[in-house]
Amino acid sequence: QQKGGKEGASGMNTPDELKALHEKCDAFADQIDEITNRRNASRRVAELVYKISKAQGYSEHDALLYYLVGLIYDIGFLNIDPVILRSEHITEEQFNVIKTHTSIGTNMVFFIDEKNRGLFKDGVSKHHENLDGSGYPAGLKGDEIPYIARVLRVAETYIALVSSRDYKSIKDRDSALRELYEQKSQYDQDIVKTLDDIV
């Protein structure tokens, strides 16, 4: 049983609608990964989000939508100076600029159909919220954070931990999972356990 309920789209999409949406999100994913210098990271996150949500009992339709949100959750980076995004050492001021990608991105999902826009906004704006309220931008806690944002938080962190771009040393699967388990105040442990089962 999922915390916060099984929220999905307000209506079903036709296969053609999903295909068109997929093409748009796919194109943005390429741009996001290029500007952040994170090769194929968006798709890797999206694939984990899909697998986790399916394993947790979500429908194929909703899991596909979550996959699409996973492709563009960092879309706000497209309006941030790439020099900052690619810096190895960032200042506090630069980090504050980077943090604005959540609010910037929320205003960039206008191309999403109205019935799904709320879901995409939740993923884009809230994927850096932590269960204990220590995240940003709103400091949401627990069930205030929608499922799509909680699953993105886990998937994004795992991919970052096992990738060389975000950390000086690449962690192996077990080390990355251990870190997610240890930081239980931040990450939904039901989602972490499901991740553990599928990777």
Show the residue positions of the predicted features.
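Histidine- and acidic-residue-rich, metal-dependent catalytic cores
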Residues: 13-199
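Short, Lys/Arg-enriched N-terminal segments with co-localized hydrophobic residues
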Residues: 1-11
